[in-house]
């Protein structure tokens, strides 16, 4: 069993560069199945989710080459083989294969999504969209079987009953080669949706409106190869900004798009965090006299659910009391119990997190219960006096590229230990 060991209480200083967006690349890679030539992705993060996706693509017959942060995928040899639950149960984003396989082959058998345990993640919106486009869906144990083999996919008007990033992207992927026009109403607006649409358009798709709540897709017969640069990871950026404010003595975060983080940064400014925003970087000063605030997550451009956990340790430095309410994943509270082991004054009731800042944290043995909870524990361990040991670190490695090396370069006493 691997674990992360941190000797905390050290001031950190220096620069850190943000990798490509995890939440983009996990959709971009399956979308490449639709191309009839090589697609190259730049700025691909070195995370275990990418390694898993590459393995799946190779099992299906794709040729994949990786060097540094470049991923070159030739999908011409892909075959439509069933992908059972066992092979992809670590991936939340396995459902993107639904759209890409339907779009290329007219059918798909894929295991149900895995990933972090944040409560129910229904795929009903995905299925509703596919069925509107002419597919049938049925469960076979832990697998989903989809078929539009007889009639093929056709355009449709689809209203998303709730705002869903995954369902919006999946519908776009399925619709780009469907016959006719597809209109997605009440679409999610996240930057990652724009990134996927940009790749697909560069491959020859006709998508308009990505980043707004109405997306229009006119189907095309073929998609060609292209080269695409993955956008910076706004969640990784927000995590390191929170870390820099919590334990930094001056840290510059490079490869950041401020416009993707405006809601998050506004809340930090409400706390009193001092920072300087440049064109593609943010410099976070050493902090003092921070104020407790309330956080409520919301779909983009609101406060991202993926950032409420990484922000929590910084909130514990602030003076006063506050609440955190996650309206997206109300069960995203498991980090609270681990932070309490580190002597944090924090609790949860009825899905609300209640905290009182100002108490020093102490090192402890804790467990990462999901990806962003793991990030919160890393930050807390860097803040705490003494040694912190974090287990279940596979969650952390799913989403944070080179996290140990990046933190060591700032002066952190952190290491990965093989038990």
UniProtKB/Swiss-Prot annotation:
Binding site for UDP-N-acetyl-alpha-D-glucosamine: 92, 121-125, 306, 328
Gene3D superfamilies tied to this protein: Enolpyruvate transferase domain (3.65.10.10)
Location of the protein in the cell: Cytoplasm
GO biological process: cell division; cell wall organization; cellular response to antibiotic; peptidoglycan biosynthetic process; regulation of cell shape; UDP-N-acetylgalactosamine biosynthetic process
Binding residues annotated for phosphoenolpyruvate, in chain numbering: 22-23
Source domain of life: Bacteria
Residue list for modification 2-(S-cysteinyl)pyruvic acid O-phosphothioketal: 116
Keyword Transferase among record annotations: yes
Alphabetized InterPro entries for the sequence: Enolpyruvate_Tfrase_dom, Enolpyruvate_Tfrase_sf, MurA_subfamily, RNA3'P_cycl/enolpyr_Trfase_a/b, UDP_GlcNAc_COvinyl_MurA
UniProt keyword Cell cycle, yes or no: yes
GO molecular function, one term: UDP-N-acetylglucosamine 1-carboxyvinyltransferase activity
Active site: 116
Disruption of the gene: reported phenotype: No heteroresistance to fosfomycin.
Pathway in which the depicted protein is active: Cell wall biogenesis; peptidoglycan biosynthesis
Main location (coarse class): cytoplasm
Catalytic reaction annotation: phosphoenolpyruvate + UDP-N-acetyl-alpha-D-glucosamine = UDP-N-acetyl-3-O-(1-carboxyvinyl)-alpha-D-glucosamine + phosphate
Function: Cell wall formation. Adds enolpyruvyl to UDP-N-acetylglucosamine. Target for the antibiotic fosfomycin. Involved in heteroresistance to antibiotic fosfomycin. Heteroresistance is the ability of a clonal population to grow one or several subpopulations at a frequency of 10(-7) to 10(-3) in the presence of a higher antibiotic concentration than that predicted to be effective by measurement of the minimum inhibitory concentration (MIC).
Protein name per its UniProtKB record: UDP-N-acetylglucosamine 1-carboxyvinyltransferase
Source organism of this protein record: Streptococcus pneumoniae serotype 2 (strain D39 / NCTC 7466)
The encoding gene: murA1
């Amino acid at each position: 069993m691997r674990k992360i060991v941190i000797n905390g209480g050290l001031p950190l200083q220096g620069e850190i560069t943000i990798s490509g967006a995890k939440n983009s690349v996990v959709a971009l890679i399956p979308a490449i199945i639709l191309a009839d030539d090589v697609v190259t992705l730049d700025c691909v993060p070195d995370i275990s989710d990418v390694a898993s996706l590459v393995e799946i693509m190779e099992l299906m017959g794709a040729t994949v080459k990786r060097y540094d942060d470049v991923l070159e995928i030739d999908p011409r040899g892909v075959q439509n083989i069933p992908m059972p639950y066992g092979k992809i149960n670590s991936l939340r984003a396995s459902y993107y294969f639904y759209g890409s396989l339907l779009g290329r082959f007219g059918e798909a058998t894929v295991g149900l999504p895995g990933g972090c345990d944040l409560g129910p993640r229904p795929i009903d919106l995905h299925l509703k969209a596919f069925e509107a486009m002419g597919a049938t869906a049925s469960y076979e144990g832990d697998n989903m079987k989809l078929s539009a083999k007889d009639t093929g996919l056709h355009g449709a008007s689809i209203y998303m009953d709730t705002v869903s990033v995954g369902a919006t992207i999946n519908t776009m992927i399925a619709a780009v080669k469907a016959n006719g026009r597809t209109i997605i109403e009440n679409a999610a607006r996240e930057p990652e949706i724009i990134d996927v649409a940009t790749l697909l358009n560069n491959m020859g798709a006709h998508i308009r409106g990505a980043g707004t709540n109405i997306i229009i897709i006119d189907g095309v017969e073929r998609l060609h190869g292209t080269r695409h640069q993955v956008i910076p990871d706004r969640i990784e950026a927000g995590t390191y900004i929170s870390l820099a404010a919590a334990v930094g003595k001056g840290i510059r975060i490079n490869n950041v798009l401020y416009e993707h983080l405006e809601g998050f940064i506004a809340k930090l400014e409400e706390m009193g965090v001092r920072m300087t925003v440049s064109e593609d970087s943010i410099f976070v000063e050493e902090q003092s006299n921070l104020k407790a605030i309330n956080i409520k997550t919301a779909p983009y451009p609101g406060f991202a659910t993926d950032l409420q956990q990484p922000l929590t340790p910084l909130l514990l430095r602030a003076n006063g009391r506050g609440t955190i309410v996650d309206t997206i994943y109300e069960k995203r509270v498991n980090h609270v119990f681990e932070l309490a082991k580190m002597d944090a004054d924090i609790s949860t009731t009825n899905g609300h997190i209640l905290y009182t800042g100002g108490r020093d944290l102490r090192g402890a043995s804790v467990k990462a219960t999901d990806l962003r909870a793991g990030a919160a524990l890393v930050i807390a361990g860097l803040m705490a006096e003494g040694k912190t040991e974090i287990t279940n670190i596979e969650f952390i490695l799913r989403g944070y590229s080179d996290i140990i090396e990046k933190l060591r370069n700032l002066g952190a006493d952190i290491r990965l230990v093989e038990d």
